[in-house]
Design a protein with these regions (language model features):
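N-terminal core-binding DNA-recognition domain of tyrosine recombinases/integrases
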Residues: 1-46, 62-68
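Short, charged phosphate-coordinating catalytic segments
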Residues: 24-27, 83-106, 195-196
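DNA breakage-rejoining catalytic core of tyrosine-based enzymes
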Residues: 42-60, 117-126, 139-142, 157
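Basic, Lys/Arg- and aromatic-enriched nucleic-acid-binding interface segment
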Residues: 57-90
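Short basic/aromatic active-site micro-motif
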Residues: 74-75, 172-191
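Conserved tyrosine-mediated DNA breakage-rejoining catalytic core shared by Y-recombinases
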Residues: 91, 95-131
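Short, polar N-cap/turn motifs at the start of nucleic acid-interacting alpha helices
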Residues: 101-103, 172-173, 192-218
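Active-site/catalytic core of tyrosine-dependent DNA strand-transfer enzymes
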Residues: 125-173
Length: 218
């Protein structure tokens, strides 16, 4: 159980005992005092905050400006912008194969393999499809972001290194999960309702959302 989940449950239980042990109720509830010990909460790390839209734009501009001098910049640009546009987990973007990216009449769709091996499909705009295809489409079974050392896909650690590298170059801290937070935050700020937002972020089935949201974020 994660610390935040544990803390929420402890607070809920403590609140119930505190309510039941109030002088006006304790004779009825039979709870003379709150039995929960003080300072029983676990330390929880600070919640991840997304990038501002200005920071996100500056990050992409920083990568774009170095495409000629850094041979990996084009791949990194697609990796970072693609992660943001899909709103996916780092493990999902790492494992994408070319066969998972499909072209449709009105854009495309990407099949992702999420937590617990649960598959989901996210609709994308034509611009997002073109972004990935800048890398040069490979065989269906080959990874979009292959590791040059192992022949498999990029690891979580390698993608984290890419984000940190360009974050330092842009002048602020960046890590992969921050892109997922930024995706959700910016979508809500631009008027996407929360229920629509849930589909590409957490749903297990394909959702046909149309092109409104991908075009908003693009």
């Amino acid at each position: 159980m994660k610390p935040r989940t544990f803390n929420r449950r402890i607070v809920a239980i403590s609140s119930l005992y505190r309510w039941a042990s109030e002088p006006s109720r304790c004779s009825v509830t039979g709870v003379p005092r709150n039995p929960m010990p003080p300072r029983s909460l676990l330390h929880a790390p600070k919640t991840t905050r997304g990038l501002s839209e200005e920071q996100y734009a500056a990050l992409l501009a920083c990568i774009s400006g170095r495409r000629e001098s850094d041979p990996k910049a084009q791949r990194d640009y697609v990796l970072i912008k693609g992660s943001y546009l899909l709103g996916c987990r780092v493990s999902e973007i790492a494992a994408i194969r070319w066969g998972d990216i499909e072209s449709l009449d009105d854009g495309g769709q990407v099949h992702l393999l999420g937590k617990g091996g649960k598959a989901r499909t996210v609709r994308i705009s034509g611009d997002t499809l073109a972004l990935f295809e800048r890398l040069g489409r490979g065989e269906n079974c080959s990874f979009v972001f292959p590791s040059p050392r192992t022949g498999g896909h990029h690891t979580r650690q390698a993608i984290g290194d890419v984000c940190r590298k360009w974050g330092r170059a842009a002048g602020f801290h960046v890590h992969p999960h921050q892109l997922r937070h930024s995706h959700a935050t910016h979508a809500v700020q631009r008027g996407v309702d929360v229920f629509t937002l849930q589909a590409p972020l957490v749903t297990r089935q394909a959702r046909l959302l149309g092109m409104t949201w991908p075009q908003i974020l693009w």
